[in-house]
């Protein structure tokens, strides 16, 4: 059995193909529950996100994983064959560590992928398709990801608008748990802003949107993390004073937050500072607002320059992170080899003990039947020696015939080291 990683991601497959082989939790749970009864492939974890679908498994070959992935999604293997990547053992371990650390993500260093991989492992555990060996590989990958995030700067710089706004709020306000945030428009960009700020632990989220349906949808997505209030778009100006952070991204052709509205809001707030972020083009917020004392106004260009600089810093940090991942992968592989060697040594000892017991039984029987003790002991020693050295002798002969002289020389040298050690006088 080998450890394999096989799949597709944003670099190897179109979104149309990724959609075809994506799994939701319920369907995947049912498939895994069925799979645990198949001896040929019953030890696997499937990671499925919008940017990747990957199968990690202990298996005889990668082809069985490819066939399973195709069959599970009712598509021909030929549709996948030119888009999948596959890694085995050391390369598969390194790949899993890179994925969990965010080094293989579309957004370099993104933190969400680690949680997604952990959820994938948990789902497979529920379906009983995770052996102790497979589990240990994943747990070590999580350890590697934690080391990468804590010891390098690969995830410490905002590289998305939503995350950048959240980080900006932390810089302006030191205690997020006391903040009230207003998102003006509940589209894709502000949804990310709302989710990042909700995860950060803000006190309240006010959603101001023209469409009540979209506002309700966003509210449902974050309600488990933060108190949510929805207001009509027509009530925007009179509620501005309640927000410590305002993020606006309406797509309107005209400004929706006027200078006078912000000035009035500041007065109602007794001039407590406000962070206002304008993610819209054309702009939603009157740029003259920046002149008001207590208002921090940031636009798309301001944030983009920060993101570009941060992305460069992440890329630089990623070089250090890659070195760390390779070192940790090597450590795990070495540990696995030592463990495997321990099992082999135990089996070898047991085999030698069985030979010794058989020869000893034969010698005792000879003595019992009146055999000459000296001859019996000599025969016992000779037969035991022959049987114990026979496998090593055969190994040396085969190594000498092989086309790899390095292996034969290595074997000779190690045997010589053993001889030299045995010849040393015992103290």
Swiss-Prot record:
Keyword set includes Ribonucleoprotein: no
MF term (GO), any: NADP binding
Documented EC number(s): 1.2.1.70
Active site per database record: 50
Site description Important for activity, residues in chain: 95
Top-rank taxon: Bacteria
Gene3D superfamilies (UniProt xref): Glutamyl-tRNA reductase, N-terminal domain, NAD(P)-binding Rossmann-like Domain
Domain notes: Possesses an unusual extended V-shaped dimeric structure with each monomer consisting of three distinct domains arranged along a curved 'spinal' alpha-helix. The N-terminal catalytic domain specifically recognizes the glutamate moiety of the substrate. The second domain is the NADPH-binding domain, and the third C-terminal domain is responsible for dimerization.
Subunit structure of this chain's protein: Homodimer.
Protein name as it appears in the record: Glutamyl-tRNA reductase
């Amino acid at each position: 059995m080998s450890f394999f990683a096989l799949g597709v991601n944003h670099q190897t497959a179109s979104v149309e193909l990724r959609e075809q082989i994506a799994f939701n939790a319920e369907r995947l749970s049912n498939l895994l529950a069925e799979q645990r009864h198949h001896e040929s492939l019953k030890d696997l974890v499937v990671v499925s996100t919008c940017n990747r679908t990957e199968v990690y498994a202990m298996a005889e070959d990668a082809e069985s994983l490819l066939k399973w992935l195709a069959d599970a999604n009712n598509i021909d293997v030929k549709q996948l064959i030119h888009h999948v990547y596959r890694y085995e053992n050391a390369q598969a371990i390194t790949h899993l560590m890179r994925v969990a650390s965010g080094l293989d993500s579309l957004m370099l260093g993104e933190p969400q992928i680690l949680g997604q991989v952990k959820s994938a492992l948990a789902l497979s555990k529920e379906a009983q398709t995770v052996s102790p060996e497979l589990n240990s590989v994943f747990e070590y990958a999580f350890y590697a990801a934690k080391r990468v995030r804590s010891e390098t700067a690969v995830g410490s710089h905002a590289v998305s608008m939503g995350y950048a706004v959240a980080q900006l709020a932390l810089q302006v306000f030191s205690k997020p748990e006391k903040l009230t945030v207003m998102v003006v428009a509940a589209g894709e960009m502000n949804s990310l802003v709302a989710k990042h700020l909700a995860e950060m632990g803000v006190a309240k989220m006010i959603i101001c949107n023209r469409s009540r349906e979209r506002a309700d949808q966003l509210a449902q997505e974050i309600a488990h993390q933060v108190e949510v209030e929805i207001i009509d778009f027509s009530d925007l100006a009179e509620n501005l004073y309640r927000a410590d952070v305002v993020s606006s991204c309406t797509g309107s052709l005209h400004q929706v937050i006027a200078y006078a509205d912000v000035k009035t809001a500041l007065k109602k707030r007794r001039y407590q500072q406000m962070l206002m972020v304008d993610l819209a083009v054309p702009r939603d917020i009157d740029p003259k607002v920046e002149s008001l004392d207590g208002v921090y106004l940031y636009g798309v260009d301001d944030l983009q320059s920060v993101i570009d600089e941060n992305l460069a810093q992440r890329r630089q940090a990623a070089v250090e992170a890659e070195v760390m991942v390779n070192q940790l992968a090597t450590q795990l592989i070495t540990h696995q080899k030592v463990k495997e060697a321990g099992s082999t040594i135990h089996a070898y000892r047991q085999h030698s003990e069985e030979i010794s017991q058989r020869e000893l039984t034969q010698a005792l029987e000879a003595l019992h039947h009146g055999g000459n003790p000296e001859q019996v002991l000599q025969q016992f020693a000779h037969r035991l020696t022959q049987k114990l050295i026979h496998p090593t002798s055969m190994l040396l002969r085969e190594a000498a015939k092989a086309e790899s002289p390095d292996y034969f020389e290595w074997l000779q040298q190690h045997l010589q080291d053993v001889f030299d050690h045995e010849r040393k006088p015992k103290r």
